[in-house]
């Protein structure tokens, strides 16, 4: 808790998780920019049981992508345990925490309305500001949640924020820096099984065919 003008303010903690996942897109960004971290996620609990970002929806393949939940013991995080990562804490008011969580949950519940901002990501690394409604890349997603909830004042527009920028913000406190395998929260988790990427693509294809057929047969 903190005191302001004689009043007690209840504080809560948001968690910012930075990684360089080693995927094709991550490696491309790393080679072009040299950025230590190429992906960012947001968590509301210290155990990091659920992370939120705009990323691959099935945890493995690049597409489909958009606002999604991530898990440290599944998907890419399961396959690449030696990737570099960093965990930061951000102290916010109870009201800002609630607004951030409500906004994030709304986007998760209405995921069909949102898309991954591929062009915006490219322009971001070129330092060109470009906004497209309901389209987000990872750092844009986290930045808008934090900014619009009043949790954090950004040094630049959300469409220009890079994951590595968060490692330089004075408001954030570093809790861990190292490999994913050494992260205490992940060490306490039961690891899942690695799924076949081919099987995932087939499921995505079958899902798309089913949706298309449903739309065609509806009266």
PLM regions and their residue ranges:
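Glycine-rich catalytic cores of cysteine/serine-nucleophile enzymes that process amide/ester linkages
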Residues: 19-89, 123-127
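Short, Lys/Arg-enriched N-terminal segments with co-localized hydrophobic residues
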Residues: 1-10
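Short, highly charged low-complexity linear segments
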Residues: 74-85, 157-168, 197-212
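Conserved small/polar residues in nucleotide/adenosyl-binding loops
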Residues: 213-219
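Catalytic cysteine-centered active-site loop
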Residues: 22, 26-27, 59-63, 148-182
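Donor-binding and catalytic core of enzymes assembling or modifying cell-surface/extracellular glycoconjugates
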Residues: 11-35, 166, 178-209
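Active-site nucleophile-His-acid catalytic modules used for acyl/amide transfer and hydrolysis
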Residues: 25-32, 79-159
